[in-house]
């Protein structure tokens, strides 16, 4: 009788809270994990959340600058209800980036560690092994030097669209992309972590209600770039079935390099390591503490584009390389040969990619700097190698982008439009064409909206800034206060597009604006307060750069667009 009463009390408790009375426990191939349930106000579907599930061994000691290894098994029920540490990076900058980009209402203080190969899972609470829901694997951005999985709460996307959301982490900066260009440290460790996470998903996600045969990889900025790398990589074949690159593709020149030796030597010199051989450099760097490598990262001033820096003596990014493992060839060759994973692909940009966030983070062209034409040319010539364009065409480009104006504000706006086009917009169009021509179903968008919870420092005329689309994708207007009905409706529409694509390889469904496939007519979707079809994204700019670069021979050591 007593046991029966206890059962009825437990059942009543379950009904009141809307969740099962016991927290979720799931078997993985390495051991059991304990999660928690989360509910959204006004939404009947609650979500099971698992935070910090290990997908690889901690990449410490001899595993620094080495491929990730499978996690060790455990015999207990592992508690996965707290955020894992983000991968090693500057803590202040990492926290600031998290606070700027998170879709959460509350502020979460995150930790940082070299032991960071974990993933977070959000799945509808009523999942079973037979649910077979689409899986959406998120790869965060941050210039391959910053960011983490826990900035992005996947519960809204999971609850509203009945999908399993997996947010993964990968090694960053020196830990993720240090390369000597040979067998001692090939590089691309961060991309190998991404591949390892996808293997983990294939092996384990069914137990969380996911369908390993329906996996979509999606990411933004360096995450979108990483998605594009994985689309080209033979290493990731059959590990996913659809892909979405938001504001980032493999042709972003700043995130790819052919000559790794100068940066490797600079890092070794800063660390006080002998540079006699690659083996000596790698052995020495493996002995350094995490704090010592963080100091080197700080001295390198990665991502910052200060006009005071000597670009010939410094490196702004630690980049993806041709390693014969992740990438067997230059991405341009792979695209030209059409020898890649021709999965359905969404590629998108924001209307003003270099509107406010990136110039602020990179400390480039501060608003109080009065630019004239001569100074603008000098500034852009200084960073020509980063944009991947020959210096001698910059004066012509400045004429195009300043539109005949000598107004310092308009010249500054022109420079930022120039950078946004060269780094994000033109490469995205070129990659979309390559995928279309290879026979992959391709969809293209431009996001045009000003989020209500943007930083108060951001100018009101920056509509569609870098990363703005991420707020809609992860349901920020639903989680955070202050969003208008228009903004909530926009987010629900974007989540529906993304989830439809994850389900079917096609974003369209009844009740949504029609999103045309990107074919020879180059139709695409403008997403914003008014969502509508348009044609030939950035047509004038694409034609300008294509013609300009075709007239000139590339300079050595530059990766041209």
From Swiss-Prot:
InterPro entries: AB_hydrolase_fold, CarbesteraseB, Carboxylesterase_B_AS, Carboxylesterase_B_CS, Type-B_Carboxylest/Lipase. The keyword Disulfide bond applies. Disulfide bonds join 87-116, 273-284. Its EC number is 3.1.1.1. Keywords: Disulfide bond, Endoplasmic reticulum, Glycoprotein, Hydrolase, Serine esterase, Signal. It is found in: Endoplasmic reticulum lumen. The keyword Disulfide bond applies. GO terms for molecular function: carboxylesterase activity; carboxylic ester hydrolase activity. GO terms for cellular component: endoplasmic reticulum; endoplasmic reticulum lumen; lipid droplet. PROSITE patterns: CARBOXYLESTERASE_B_1, CARBOXYLESTERASE_B_2, ER_TARGET. Glycans are attached at residue 79. GO terms for biological process: lipid catabolic process. The active site is at 221 (acyl-ester intermediate), 353 (charge relay system), 466 (charge relay system). A motif (Prevents secretion from ER) lies at residues 558-561. Involved in the detoxification of xenobiotics and in the activation of ester and amide prodrugs. Monomer. Belongs to the type-B carboxylesterase/lipase family. This is Liver carboxylesterase B-1. The lineage of its organism: Eukaryota, Metazoa, Chordata, Craniata, Vertebrata.
């Amino acid at each position: 009788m007593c046991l029966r009463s206890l059962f009825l009390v437990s059942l009543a408790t379950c009904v009141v809270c809307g969740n099962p009375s016991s927290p979720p426990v799931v078997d993985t191939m390495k051991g059991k994990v304990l999660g928690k349930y989360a509910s959204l106000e006004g939404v009947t579907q609650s979500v099971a959340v698992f935070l910090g599930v290990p997908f690889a061994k901690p990449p410490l000691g001899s595993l620094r600058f080495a491929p990730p290894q499978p996690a060790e098994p455990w015999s207990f029920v592992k508690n996965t209800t707290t955020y894992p540490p983000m991968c090693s990076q500057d803590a202040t900058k990492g926290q600031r980036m998290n606070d700027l980009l998170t879709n959460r209402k509350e502020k979460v203080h995150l930790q940082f560690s070299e032991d960071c190969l974990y993933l977070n899972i959000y799945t509808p609470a009523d999942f079973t092994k037979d649910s077979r829901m689409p899986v959406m694997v998120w790869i965060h951005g941050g210039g391959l030097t910053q960011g983490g999985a826990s900035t992005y709460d996947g519960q809204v996307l999971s609850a509203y669209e009945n999908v399993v959301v997996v947010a993964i982490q990968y090694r960053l900066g020196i830990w993720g992309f240090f390369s000597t260009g040979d067998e001692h440290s090939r590089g691309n460790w961060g991309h190998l972590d991404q591949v390892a996470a996808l293997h983990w998903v294939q092996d384990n996600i069914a137990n969380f209600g996911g369908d390993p045969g329906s996996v979509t990889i999606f990411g933004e900025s360096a995450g979108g770039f990483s998605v594009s790398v994985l689309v080209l990589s033979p290493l990731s074949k059959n590990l996913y079935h659809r892909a979405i690159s938001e504001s980032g593709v493999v042709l972003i020149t700043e995130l790819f390099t052919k000559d790794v030796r100068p940066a490797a030597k600079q890092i070794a010199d800063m660390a006080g390591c002998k540079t006699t051989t690659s083996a000596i450099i790698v052995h020495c760097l493996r002995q350094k503490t995490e704090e010592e490598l963080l100091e080197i990262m700080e001295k390198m001033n990665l991502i910052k584009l200060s006009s005071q820096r000597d670009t010939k003596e410094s490196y702004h990014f630690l980049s993806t390389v041709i390693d014969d493992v992740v990438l067997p060839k230059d991405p341009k060759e792979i695209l030209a040969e059409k020898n890649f994973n021709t999965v359905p692909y969404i590629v998108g940009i924001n209307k003003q990619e270099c509107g406010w966030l990136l110039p602020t983070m990179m400390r480039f062209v501060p608003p109080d700097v009065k630019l004239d034409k001569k100074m603008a040319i000098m500034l852009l010539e200084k960073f020509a190698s980063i944009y991947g364009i020959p210096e001698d065409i910059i004066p012509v480009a400045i004429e195009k982008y300043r539109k005949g104006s000598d107004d310092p504000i308009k010249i500054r706006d022109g420079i930022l439009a120039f950078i946004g086009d060269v780094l994000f917009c033109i490469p995205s169009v070129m990659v979309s064409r390559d995928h279309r021509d290879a026979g992959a179903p391709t969809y293209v968008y431009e996001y045009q909206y000003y989020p209500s919870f943007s930083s108060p420092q951001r100018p009101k005329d920056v509509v569609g800034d870098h990363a703005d689309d991420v707020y809609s994708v992860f349901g920020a207007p639903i989680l955070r206060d202050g969003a208008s009905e228009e903004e909530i409706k926009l987010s629900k529409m974007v989540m529906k597009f993304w989830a439809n694509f994850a389900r079917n390889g096609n974003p369209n469904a009844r009740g949504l604006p029609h999103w045309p496939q990107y074919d020879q007519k180059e139709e695409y979707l403008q997403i914003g307060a008014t969502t509508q079809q348009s044609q030939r994204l950035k047509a004038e700019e694409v034609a300008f750069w294509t013609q300009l670069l075709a007239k000139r021979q590339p300079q050595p050591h530059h990766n041209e667009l």
